[in-house]
Amino acid sequence: MEKLLLSEIAKAINSQYHKEAEITEICTDTRSLTEGCLFIALKGERFDAHDFVPKAFELGAAACITEKEIENCECMVVDDCRKALKDIAHLYRNKFTPFL
């Protein structure tokens, strides 16, 4: 993945974040999280990744996107994490010029 700046991501998802970092990976599962990635807390039928946000930071996530404030964690808060993921994909795709 090409690098994205957290400031670009925050703007794309209509959120705020006061730290800057280059993101080269996005994770939705702390079991496969790599240091420096962006963790997005998705909710499923049997899980809520918001429960794992502190663990994501412990494992080295550069930032997290959540749908609510998490105690002792500075996150980018949005209304819908799935929409935020879509908006990031749109931002990323627009960085490239396709060959036709």
Where are these regions (language model features)?
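N-terminal leader/targeting and accessory segments in enzymes
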Residues: 1-87, 91
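Walker A (P-loop) phosphate-binding motif
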Residues: 89-100
